[in-house]
């Protein structure tokens, strides 16, 4: 992918992730763009990988769909072979390896969060294959606005309700300033009981 096309592709979206004591919250806007064209106003940018892992997606839609499908298949295969759910870190590492192997062809950035036997965790995986563990972070063109709020208001002892409210607030701040983000906020909460998604 040319640098010019990649620059246009990566100019939309705001996704947010944060970790609590026993949960992970993911949030994303709903606007899908192609350059400055609004291609869709009701896009789900949060996807379920397994019963205890979800991810946000940013970048080229087709690339993201292929990567998500691969991660789902690998998670199911792991569970079939071992009888256990794939650890969150393993899913993030696999995504990183795939993106590294196919760079610069695949243009995807993900936040991968979940709860497993090690507790809650959140990983950021970029299109170069870089993977980092985070307490809170954001991706996309609206991320500078979202991160500036998270820097000031995130606490490790947030309740689930407080964390959801903070994630929504962070995305909404980006919606107010970033033309590549818009149309409302979707939320996923991940606990040991599973994943709950809703539109707010």
Curated annotation (Swiss-Prot):
Q: Which domain of life is it from?
A: Archaea
Q: List this protein's GO terms for biological process.
A: proteasomal protein catabolic process
Instruction: Report the locations given in the UniProt record.
Output: Cytoplasm
Activity regulation: The formation of the proteasomal ATPase PAN-20S proteasome complex, via the docking of the C-termini of PAN into the intersubunit pockets in the alpha-rings, triggers opening of the gate for substrate entry. Interconversion between the open-gate and close-gate conformations leads to a dynamic regulation of the 20S proteasome proteolysis activity.
The propeptide segment or segments lie at 1-12
What Enzyme Commission number(s) apply to this enzyme? Answer: 3.4.25.1
Swiss-Prot/TrEMBL catalytic activity = Cleavage of peptide bonds with very broad specificity
Tell me the InterPro entries matching this sequence.
Answer: Ntn_hydrolases_N (IPR029055), Pept_T1A_Psome_bsu_arc (IPR019983), Pept_T1A_subB (IPR000243), Proteasome_bsu_CS (IPR016050), Proteasome_sua/b (IPR001353), Proteasome_suB-type (IPR023333)
Q: Which UniProt keywords apply?
A: Autocatalytic cleavage, Cytoplasm, Hydrolase, Protease, Proteasome, Threonine protease, Zymogen
Active site residues of this protein? 13 (nucleophile)
Database matches in Pfam families: Proteasome
Please give the GO cellular component terms listed in this UniProt entry. Answer: cytoplasm; proteasome core complex, beta-subunit complex
The set of disulfide-linked cysteines is none
What does the record give under GO molecular function? threonine-type endopeptidase activity
Function noted in UniProt: Component of the proteasome core, a large protease complex with broad specificity involved in protein degradation.
Q: Which family does it belong to?
A: Belongs to the peptidase T1B family.
Q: Under what name is this protein listed?
A: Proteasome subunit beta 1
